Amino acid sequence: MEKKENVSSLTANESERRQIADWKRKYGKVFCYEVDGEKLYFRQPDRKTLSAAGVIAKNDPMTYNEFVLKNSLLGGDSSLLDDNSVFYGLSQMMDELVSAKVGELKNL
């Protein structure tokens, strides 16, 4: 029986790796947020999502974060976003999710 559990666990891990690889091909960056043994997967939000979040949220950073997180979620138990402590934890990581490449601008 233990052998069967190991095989199904291995299959689940392989399935998860394949799904993540598919997401990376489609979206580029993929992030995993793990809390209490549960995982949530996010893509880096695109400009349309960030623009819409700015319009909807205006001066409310929590609404902004909620919109971006819900619209960037790829997989996992979405009901975790309703847990305030999970939401607050993710909100503290928004800069990482919405990271930018910084280059150098030269006056020629």
Describe each region flagged by the PLM.
Residues 2-3, 27, 34-108:
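Short, surface-exposed, charged amphipathic helix/loop patches that serve as local interaction elements
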Residues 12-13, 17, 32, 77-78:
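Alpha-helical interaction segments
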